[in-house]
């Protein structure tokens, strides 16, 4: 129930993210990092280089531009799609401040986060809090990720004011390998539809229902165990042939289905569950042949086909 509720809350924002075509990239006047180095490019991209331990923080200063939505795009380091996935990349906490002309800072309150997809162990909404969640790809980054941060009210700037962006990283994988954001863009939109999204009664209702269900879940005592669950259609991952069985050497992209050699009638099979039903069907001779070969091996010491895995 919780995953479906979370996706229902995110869906209007996901659709608006796809529909919003006009975004204005930030123009940086200063970029700092507690570790390593940040480099900006005319395209608006920011690249991180060097050594980045956990808890690395980025502090960026940009020229002011009014906005109703603040988009962060995490981009894989590699240009070769077949080489993905790569090391995880997670924005743990994002905070924004106005820098007044006299140097004083005013916090910009962020109300919600909508993402291109909601899947995995981290909730993107956690990136505007102080928890251990965040937005990005964890423990691996499988492709470009996008999230839109919505302020509590449209943000406007006076003359000579600037925008300060703080990006905090806390996530790490086994061995203490930090999952910092290493290549990204930040841009803004002044589309009022983003503000209207938060004022929609359905949004508030769905958030309240989700929070109530989450509180009930957290009150259940017991041991957490992993559960396999099919990813939503917007969060599916690319599947490729491993050439020679080597995962580092990838071939063509593959679509869900049954190998033609085993599916003479070319029945449409789109999911693993359907394939399991197909394999175990009483009408499928493959299952009987495998079983007969296993029984032969157990009873006579050798199967009809000696290598049982073939």
Annotated model-derived regions:
Residues 65-67, 78-93, 176-184:
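Short coil-to-beta strand junction motifs in C2/discoidin
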Residues 46-55, 135-145, 264-269:
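Extracellular beta-rich ligand/substrate-recognition surface
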Residues 1-44, 49, 115-116, 120-130, ...:
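Short, functional "switch" segments adjacent to catalytic/cofactor/reactive centers
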Residues 87-119, 126, 184-188:
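Extended low-complexity, serine/threonine- and proline-enriched intrinsically disordered segments
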Residues 55, 64-71, 157-164:
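Extended extracellular/luminal ectodomain segments enriched in beta-structured repeat modules
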Residues 59-62, 121-160:
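Short, surface-exposed tryptophan/glycine-enriched loops
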Residues 74-78, 166-178:
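Short beta-strand-plus-loop segments that form exposed binding edges in beta-rich domains
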Residues 187-212:
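Extracellular polysaccharide-targeting segments
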């Amino acid at each position: 129930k919780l995953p479906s509720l979370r996706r229902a809350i995110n869906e209007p924002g996901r659709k608006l993210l796809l529909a919003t075509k006009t975004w204005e990239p930030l123009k940086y006047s200063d970029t700092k990092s507690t570790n390593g180095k940040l480099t900006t490019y005319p395209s608006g991209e920011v690249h991180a280089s060097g050594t980045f331990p956990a808890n690395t923080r980025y502090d960026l200063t940009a020229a002011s531009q009014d906005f109703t939505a603040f988009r962060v795009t995490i981009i894989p380091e590699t240009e070769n799609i077949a080489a993905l996935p790569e090391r995880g990349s997670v924005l743990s906490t994002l905070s924004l401040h106005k820098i007044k002309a006299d140097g004083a800072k005013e916090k910009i309150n962020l109300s919600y986060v909508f993402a291109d997809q909601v899947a995995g162990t981290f909730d993107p909404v956690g990136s505007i809090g102080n928890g251990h969640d965040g937005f990005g790809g964890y423990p691996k980054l499988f492709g470009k990720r996008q999230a839109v941060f919505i302020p509590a009210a449209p943000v406007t700037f006076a003359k000579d004011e600037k925008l300060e962006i703080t990006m905090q990283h806390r996530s790490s994988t086994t061995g203490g390998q930090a999952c910092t954001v290493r290549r990204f863009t930040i841009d803004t939109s002044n589309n009022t539809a983003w503000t209207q999204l938060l004022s929609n009664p359905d949004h508030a209702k769905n958030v309240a229902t989700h929070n109530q269900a989450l509180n009930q879940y957290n009150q259940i005592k017991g041991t957490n165990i992993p559960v396999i669950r099919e990813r939503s259609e917007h969060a599916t991952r690319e599947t490729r042939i491993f050439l020679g069985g080597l995962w580092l050497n990838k071939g063509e992209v593959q679509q869900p289905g049954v190998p033609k050699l085993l599916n003479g009638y070319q029945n449409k099979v789109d999911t693993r569950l359907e394939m399991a039903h197909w394999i175990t069907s009483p009408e499928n001779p493959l299952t009987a042949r495998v079983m007969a070969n296993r029984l032969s091996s157990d009873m006579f010491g050798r199967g009809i086909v000696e290598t049982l895995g073939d």
